[in-house]
Amino acid sequence: MSNYIRPLSDAVFTIASDDLWIESLAIQQLHTTANLPNMQRVVGMPDLHPGRGYPIGAAFFSVGRFYPALVGNDIGCGMALWQTDILTRKYNADKFEKRLSDLDDVAEESWLEENLPSAFAQHPWRSSLGSIGGGNHFAELQQVDQIINAELFALAGLDAQHLQLLVHSGSRGVGQSILQRHIASFSHHGLPQGSDDALRYIAEHDDALAFACINRQMIALRIMQQVKATGSPVLDVAHNFVSACQIGDQQGWLHRKGATPDDNGLVIIPGSRGDYSWIVQPVANEKTLHSLAHGAGRKWGRTECKGRLAAKYTATQLSRTELGSRVICRDKQLIFEEAPQAYKSAESVVQCLVQAGLIIPVARLRPVLTLKNSGGKKG
């Protein structure tokens, strides 16, 4: 086993390096999760950080029973990358910032009627489609900064002369509704495989997965229409879900909470809004539960960010980054909570995965313009 895939007990592992900081509370939460009934193995990713009871940036394998609470309330949250036809050399920061600042958080009903796929036209949560949501969700125009593997880059249909669009969002209120109903009935005890309740949850879960994927498509479409661009999808990968899976000779359930699959083609590991993102080719590995980091991982909790930063920066100053990119976020609390300083370096996470033999880097992307939820604020 790689020196970077580290056993903490018979059932608990982390992907880590000596110079990669992981908060002790997150490790405690890994051990707590490993003690759940029927849990066989848990693996913390390099971006591991504490969550509300269960860690984020981890994968969990159980047999005979699965745990919706491990997946959490944003079922299907993930990353979608699009190759746009926006010429990098013609990109005008002022013009694009103005156009995207005029984009409402929620799509208009007339737009939904014209653009929604027929399968979602009558969905009870249809009004949320095309909306980014709060927290760490975002859409970001990016520029190819470095091509590391030219062959894989070309095979993916990527183009360094044009900008990319990255969308990070999930199932919006759908997943929250599913989890609330589940917890009200079953608390955190999980569901026995094959039971009526388990089958019902999986059906709702799969609907949320599909909803999240379409939501990312609709977000990308709204943004590209707003800036008069077109594009084509490169990848779409969820990092919050549960699925039937065989690990070794055991058939069971693989939960991913902030963990990117390594067995579904190219993935992107994003940094904070002031950091690079990395397109990588996974190298499948059963020991790590076929999972990788889903981002850089937080260093600071949300509640401490403004206290740490407000004396040094105004919200306006935080709308510009050290890489020269711009941030559209009228929610003054959120712009502090999601500051680049609150996150680890994406490169440290990526290098840990490289050293563990789990990925092949393909390209590095630099942020150009990041769009966040306005929190209902108007410019």
Describe every region a protein language model picked out.
Residues 2-29, 37-43, 50-56, 60, ...:
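Domain-length cofactor-binding catalytic modules of enzymes
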Residues 81-84:
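N-terminal glycine-rich flavin-associated loop
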Residues 34:
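Glycine-rich loop/turn
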